[in-house]
A protein has these predicted regions:
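Membrane-embedded beta-barrel scaffold of Gram-negative outer-membrane proteins
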Residues: 315-319, 323-329, 333-339, 530, ...
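C-terminal beta-signal and adjacent terminal beta-strands/loops
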Residues: 683-692, 712-760
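Gram-negative outer-membrane beta-barrel transporters
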Residues: 587-592, 606-694, 729, 755-759
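Face-selective signature of the C-terminal outer-membrane beta-barrel domain
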Residues: 310-332, 363-478
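Outer-membrane beta-barrel translocator/receptor signature
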Residues: 146-148, 159-237, 243-248, 308, ...
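Acidic, small-polar-rich N-terminal luminal/periplasmic segments of exported/outer-membrane proteins
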Residues: 41-180, 571
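Structural signature of Gram-negative outer-membrane beta-barrels, strongest in the C-terminal barrel
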Residues: 240-242, 372, 391-393, 399-403, ...
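Acidic/polar loop-and-plug regions of large Gram-negative outer-membrane beta-barrel proteins
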Residues: 218-223, 235-317, 335-372, 413-445, ...
């Protein structure tokens, strides 16, 4: 097992490798940069170059006023061109271009994750996903049909967005009307009955007005999985007034409907590290893996969601150097699902005979009926000016936000046991019925922030930012009385069994101060070194709207707990080489997280935990030649618990669901005017799994390589085809595993996708 956990370059120590990288990258980058420069009379002249479609030069968020190459943070921008070339139809697929980021966690116990359940640098980042800089709530899968680019920022983002995950954030930028007319359409077919169509129409009306319409429809089965299906439709109309003038108004609407059959995973029997949970079930030690096509749900399982988002943004250029923006957004995400998952402990196994083919496991029904809403108004001012000889690049603003969540209580669903090796899904437990035992959460936030980049000299910059959030969270929860099991309560006198009884009604208010500071020095016109330090906080219940009374021992969201706090240090270098077509970056980072809530041996919670994530990351994005494009990166990260209860299955202090080594690279080459070829590979190293007392489950997932390829053919200016092949060598791997380790999701096998792209 130890060899499986080692990346091929393990013999290089992290710090030695990074130091050599930073020292070595400078002369190499300088030599490459010189190709785009000419020298006359000792005057440096940089030739103009065409920006790479694989390396957007600027964040679309006005809070990041500097180019990506001059931002003192690790930032990856995944462009629309990369998304199209790879056929990435959802956010999770797009994030495969960022090393160490992915949906590695499959849920706790019988509960399973849904949607974009993203982990980044040792932390759950699924509640730190933003659209146009505004929080997007909901455990749904986000389609890319209306996405211009995806921006991934590693390290604390509390100064940028308020409460957020301690190790990073993800910002999806929506498509907007532009000042040219055109139509792009695509039709795709592929493995597992994949069918998808998209339409993108932009039409100019007059001199300063344009409308845009994006439409998407998709139906598919999950490749390699029986019964698992996905179906979604989306429409995104928008209109812009005043394009090319000092006053611009954008009106946007997004509607997405999804009807999916969720996947609760399959048993880990037969995986490396698995052993039977008891002596009486020892036959499972040599009975072999289950068929990865097996579906352990029921024909009644479903995952339905509806997203509606309306946005109005007004921009006014006060002068050539100063712009004020005001954005108002209302959004609602409703999700309703019934998902079946197996329970793999020894007490859950029934053995009618000695033949394991007759054995069954208990099933549990995971249910959710939730509505998330957000209403926000945000004003931002950006300005560039001088005070004496010092230049300023300022971004400041205020935000008013109300977020609400209602979890509707539903009556429990009872399911029969399922055969371990030959599951039968022809079970119809019926749909969900509400019982009135709801949980309601609401958070109101007022925030004010200011960022400034100071140009001290031609080569030296300082930057800093501060954000103050004043928040107020209210939460109430009810339980249907007279039930059984964990969390059950008795019915008060005169109250009928099954009636909702309020068990929690509390509130929490407070202030959060987040800040960041950095410095950057240009070694040459094209390269720099930088340092950065950032502080980010998240209060109890900050990611799920759930609170518990002060002093209550059985909740991690007590109102008397302090906010979680993350401190990140980063030192790095960025180089624009080859006529500024290619961006090379390298960074060394450390994040310390404190005020972590830990569960004690008796099941109560205390706040004394500390975690640390440290390592280095290198990346590349852009054009090596005008015809050769590339995006990729490598990270080595060590995530450990410095103080608190060890949560890894093997008893170590390692944080689970965090690969120590991760690599990704995608490259595309325009061989002729009409033919393009692309190929990519990614590596996810071995990961520790969490622990909840499960016996015999794997402590690790094994590392794996996956390769993809693409062939493109241009028929004429109006039509081109592309063939994408995923998992080219049909690698068998564990994509995600749940906390107990009884269930996992197998990686997608080799699949094909043929797309016709039309342009008018």
């Amino acid at each position: 097992m130890e060899n499986n956990r080692n990346f091929p370059a393990r013999q290089f120590h992290s710090l030695t490798f990074f130091a050599g990288l930073c020292i070595g990258i400078t002369p190499v980058a300088q030599a490459l940069a010189a190709e785009g420069q000419t020298n006359a009379d000792d005057t440096l002249v940089v030739e103009a170059s065409t920006p790479s479609l694989y390396a957007p030069q600027q964040s679309a968020d006005p809070k990041f006023s500097r180019p990506v190459a001059d931002t003192t943070r690790t930032m990856t921008v995944i462009s629309e061109q990369v998304i199209k070339d790879q056929g990435a139809t959802n956010l999770t697929d797009a994030l495969k271009n960022v090393p160490g980021v992915g949906a590695f966690f499959a849920g706790e116990n019988g509960n399973s994750t849904t949607g974009d359940a993203i982990y980044m640098r040792g932390a759950d980042t699924s509640n730190s996903i933003y659209i146009d800089g505004i929080r997007d709530i909901g455990s749904v899968s986000r389609d890319t049909f209306n996405t211009e680019q995806v921006e991934v920022i590693k390290g604390p983002s509390g100064t940028d967005y308020g409460r957020s995950a301690p190790t990073g954030s993800i910002n999806m930028i929506s498509k907007q009307p532009r000042n040219d007319s055109g139509i792009d359409a695509s039709a795709s077919i592929g493995s597992a009955w994949f069918r998808r169509g998209t339409l993108d129409v932009n039409q100019v009306i007059g001199d300063t007005t344009a409308v845009r319409l994006n439409v998407m429809g998709e139906k598919t089965h999950d490749a390699g999985r029986d019964k698992v299906k996905n179906e979604r439709y989306g429409v995104a109309p928008s209109i812009a007034f005043g394009l090319g003038t000092a006053n611009r108004l954008y009106l946007n609407y997004l509607h997405v409907t999804q009807h999916n059959t969720p996947d609760g995973g399959i048993p880990t029997i037969g995986l490396p590290g698995y052993s039977a949970p008891s002596a009486g079930t020892a036959a499972l030690n040599h009975s072999g893996k289950v068929d990865t096509h097996n579906f352990y749900g029921t024909d009644s399982d479903y995952d339905d969601s509806t997203t509606d988002t309306a946005t109005m943004r007004f921009e006014h250029d006060i002068n050539d150097n100063t712009t004020i923006r005001n954005t108002t957004r209302w959004s609602r995400v409703k999700q309703d699902y019934l998902m079946t998952a197996i329970m793999g402990g020894a007490s859950n196994i029934t053995q009618p005979t000695s033949d394991v083919n007759s054995w069954t496991w208990s099933s549990t029904a995971n249910t959710k009926d939730v509505s998330n809403k957000i209403l926000t108004n945000q004003t931002n001012l950006t300005s560039t000016f001088y005070t004496g000889s010092i230049g300023h690049d300022v971004s400041t603003g205020v935000e008013f936000t109300r977020e609400t969540q209602t979890n509707y209580g539903v009556n429990p669903v009872t399911l029969p046991a399922v055969n371990i090796y030959h599951p039968d899904s022809s079970i119809h437990p019926g749909g969900l019925t509400r019982n009135g035992a709801n949980a309601n959460g609401q958070t109101d936030t007022f925030a004010i922030y200011a960022f400034d980049t100071l140009q001290i000299t031609r080569d030296f910059e300082l930057n800093g930012g501060i954000r103050l959030d004043n928040y107020h969270t209210e939460y109430d929860s009810a339980t249907a009385c007279g039930g059984s099991g964990r969390g059950a309560i008795t019915c008060p006198a005169g109250v009928a069994k099954g009636s909702p009884v309020t068990t929690v009604d509390t509130a929490k208010s407070g202030n959060l101060v987040n800040w960041k500071a950095g410095a950057l020095y240009h070694l040459t016109e094209n390269g720099n070194v930088y340092i950065n330090y950032a502080v980010s906080q998240q209060p109890p219940g900050g990611n799920n709207f759930a609170l518990a009374q002060s002093g209550s021992g059985n909740s991690a969201n007590r109102t008397d707990f302090k906010p979680q706090k993350a401190n990140t240090s980063e030192i790095g270098t960025k180089w624009q080489v080859l006529d500024k077509r290619l961006l090379l970056t390298a960074a060394l980072f450390r994040t310390d997280i404190e005020n972590e809530v830990e569960q004690n041996d008796d099941g109560t919670y205390s706040q004394y935990g500390k975690k640390r994530v440290e390592g280095y990351e290198i990346s590349v994005a852009g054009n090596i030649t005008p015809a050769w494009q590339v995006i990729g990166g490598y990270t080595q990260q060590k995530a450990t618990i410095k103080n608190g209860k060890d949560v890894a299955q093997d008893g170590s202090s390692s944080l689970p669901y965090t690969p120590e080594h991760a690599f990704t690279l995608w490259s595309q080459y325009q061989a002729t005017d009409d033919i393009s070829v692309g190929a990519g590979a990614r590596y996810i190293g071995s990961m520790h799994k969490g622990s909840d007392g499960a016996v015999g489950t794997p402590a690790f997932t094994e590392g794996y390589w996956v390769a993809d390829a693409k062939l493109g053919y241009r028929v004429n200016r109006n039509l081109d085809f592309q063939l994408n092949v995923y998992n080219l060598f049909d690698t068998d791997y564990v994509a995600s595993i749940n906390k107990s380790g009884y269930r996992y999701h197998p990686g997608e096998p080799r699949t094909f996708l043929l797309t016709a792209n039309m342009h008018f």
